[in-house]
Amino acid sequence: MNVEVAINDKKTMEIIAYEMKYVNNRVEKSDIVCIPFEVEFFQGYMRIYNECFYEMRKALDIQPYNFLNEYNQIVEKVKDIYLLLNQGEITGSVACYGNEIDDLIVNKKFQHKGYGKQLLLWGMQHIRAKSNEPITLHVAEWNNDAFMLYKKVGFEIANVEKIR
């Protein structure tokens, strides 16, 4: 539950995030194939990334609301970012940093069609191919749809973190 607290006459929403872990060795098979990130897709990726996180960042007053605006913000991370394409258009993306899944996004026009789950499973398989360590991810309490997906797939809360 989010709680509003008055700080210096400004209302600030408390931000709670869950660290979640998947400890099973077996991962359900994904029906998709992702490709490594390529710079030619940056503009589309940036648009989708910002669209996906805008509502949450605004609701939680995390500024800037449109965080991603330059390639150099992700240049060190692109080797771990994977894209799902549909006829050359980005359907979604998932980042796999070691044993952590991050920045799982689905193009708004493809949402609610199962791509989020498929990207999650693909990322989990990608990690499992290299390691049997627990797979981790973080999700804001605000993002209940993502939280419920992660629980349904088998992730469990390992830690509750108060961000602000």
Task: Please place each PLM-identified region on the residue numbering.
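Helix-loop element at the rim of GNAT/NAT acetyltransferase active sites that forms part
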Residues: 47-60
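Conserved beta-strand in the GNAT
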Residues: 83, 88-105
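Acyl-donor-binding surface of acyltransferase catalytic domains
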Residues: 1-31, 164
